[in-house]
Amino acid sequence: MALLSVIRRWHFREHLSIREICRRTGLSRNTIRKYLRAGGAEPKFNVPERPSKLDPFADRLSAWLKTESKKSRKQKRTMKQLHSDLVSLGYEGSYNRVAAFAREWRDDRQRELQTTGRGTFVPLAFEPGEAFQFDWSEDWAIIGNERTKLQVAHTKLSYSRAFIVRAYLLQTHEMLFDAHNHAFRVFGGIPGRGIYDNMRTAIDKVGRGKERDVNVRFMAMASHYVFEPEFCNPASGWEKGQVEKNVQDARHRFFQPVPRFPSLEALNDWLEQRCKEFWAKTPHGQMRGTIADIWVEEVPALMPASRPFDGFVEYTKRVTPTCLVHLERNRYSVPASLANRPVSLRVYPDRVVVAAEGQIVCEHRRVIDRSHDRPGQTIYDWRHYLAVVQRKPGALRNGAPFVELPDVFRTLQQYLLKKPGGDREMVDILALVLQHDEQAVLSAVDMALRSGVPTKTHVLNLLHRLVDGKSLTPPTLDAPQALTLTNEPKANVERYDTLRKTEVRHAS
């Protein structure tokens, strides 16, 4: 192409003769004339089609490439493996020819995808109260001066586009149920359909087409709220594009820069408030008015929510001889009467409830620590061990559950343990909380300490007077006039001197 441009420039601009051009280029006159008549077109050469050794295997290789394109990156065969498989079938060509064929096949497939229906979508329209969309995302926040990775639940009404964002530490079933409880509370009702991707908190197994093995507890929640769950095709986020867009918007609105809060509860309260503020100032986009305006129109079409779903996840645990149950590397105490017995552990987002024989026996604040660099925590309730120390009062001195006794009990313990039998007496006083109100027992102990008589008998006396409603201060008596003393008696100790006289001895 460059030589053609030079020949044309010499002839048409510099007016050189064909003879001179032939001398400079070494080409024949006929070739020069042909180039000049060709105009600006590039010279073409007839290249005969040459058969390739890969031609008999082209269909098989195309089928292999199509199959491999549907596999994950780690499961795909390499070009060298495909070349080896072709060689085993009788292919005698080079690896480079196979690699070139694969490149051409990928280019053709890419062009086909760009010119077909894939990548084009149909706009969706929803009726009021028809559906909501749900999705998870990951973001960061500083909770209690520690940078924490959060699992953020996004719920969005498809008609009004009202949305709610709520943060959790884990992406588990109990968190999913809690997110729905709060979303329906904020929305003021329940739509008829829920649109999800194939998240592991809802789907146990993805089948062919629309077949799904839905989690039993998730279906229990959907049945409780009377909505129909609908799951998108795998890798088809555009089927719930509203909430996918909401994930991007929420990251810019709420998590950039990284928010800082003393607790997760404070963060969620702030997120709920900010979401409602965005409802009021964000235009709907397709209808006149803000998101808040359209949401007010949609609320009557939502089914009113009755009571929140009891969204716990239940495990069967065996209580250890030290009256503990284990969950997520942490340990929680249970009453000593359940030691070495199976119990039901109901896990909520913020608490752990222990049930036995159909009755709730205790409850603890849930501890979630995803750092494996720190050991698990043990959460005690000293009341659970009172039955043990009643049999073994000496365990009260160094018992780990009794480190967190109320300050009043700690002060009394320091006094009683200095006396013989103080262990038993202290245990008897602590055991009073099993039959009486704990606050009343604490008040009785506090009054006994302030009176300077911190004994079991005095504490019992004060406690019974508190329980019976009797006054703890002696009453003032208003005696009648007839009983008033006119002459108060005066002490005269000299009269005892008569007893000191010498005794007269009598003869026997």
Curated annotation (Swiss-Prot):
Annotated HTH IS21-type domain residues: 3-65
Origin: domain of life: Bacteria
Cited InterPro entries: HTH_IS21_transposase_type (IPR017894), Integrase_cat-core (IPR001584), IstA-like_C (IPR054353)
GO molecular function: DNA binding
Positions of the Integrase catalytic domain: 124-299
PROSITE patterns documented for this protein: HTH_IS21, INTEGRASE
Keyword Electron transport: no
Family statement drawn from the similarity comment of this UniProt entry: Belongs to the transposase IS21/IS408/IS1162 family.
PANTHER family hit by this protein: INTEGRASE PROTEIN, TRANSPOSASE RV3428C-RELATED
NCBIfam families per record: transpos_IS21
Function comment: Required for the transposition of the insertion element.
Protein name as it appears in the record: Transposase
Gene: nmoT
